[in-house]
Regions:
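Extended, low-polarity transmembrane helix blocks
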Residues: 1-35, 47-66, 70, 77-138
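A glycine-rich, hydrophobic loop/mini-helix early in the fold
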Residues: 38-45
Length: 138
């Protein structure tokens, strides 16, 4: 049963991250988008990191987006699952800490940040492999 739980968590976390990335690149319809384009996302990133210079906040936004793309594909495929799940949890926790320090604790709950961190940590703890490249590559 745990292999199905892990598979579900991998799918849930990876598709959520890919959806957020798709939103940043305007791949979702405008009426359902949060940001709609990368410029809006970078402005949002700047609001979460007001103590950073704009150029550094923008770099952070791009780096986070790149990491989310890589991590979500790895989780989806089950490649280096334990490591990538821990890294994903750390990345999302950084997002949560930035939200907490800039807009408050409630926003982290509204965006289910800590649920996502918990899901990532759970993935990293579940050792049984199911539909993972890791089970083929040793």
């Amino acid at each position: 049963m745990t292999k199905y739980i892990k598979l579900f968590l991998r799918l849930a976390v990876s598709t959520a991250m890919l959806s957020a990335v798709a939103d940043r690149f305007g791949l979702w319809a405008a009426k359902i988008s949060v940001w709609g384009n990368m410029d809006n996302f970078l402005q949002y990133t700047q609001s979460l990191l007001p103590y950073f210079p704009t150029s550094l906040a923008n770099a952070g936004g791009w780096i986070a987006t790149l990491l989310e793309m890589v991590f979500s594909v790895c989780l989806l495929l089950g490649f280096k699952t334990e490591l990538v799940a821990k890294l994903s949890g750390a990345l999302i926790a950084c997002f949560g800490l930035a939200m907490f320090t800039s807009v408050g604790l409630k926003a982290t709950f509204d965006y289910s940040v800590w649920n996502a961190v918990g899901a990532c940590l759970a993935i990293s703890c579940l050792k049984e492999k199911h539909w993972e490249i890791d089970s083929v590559i040793k």
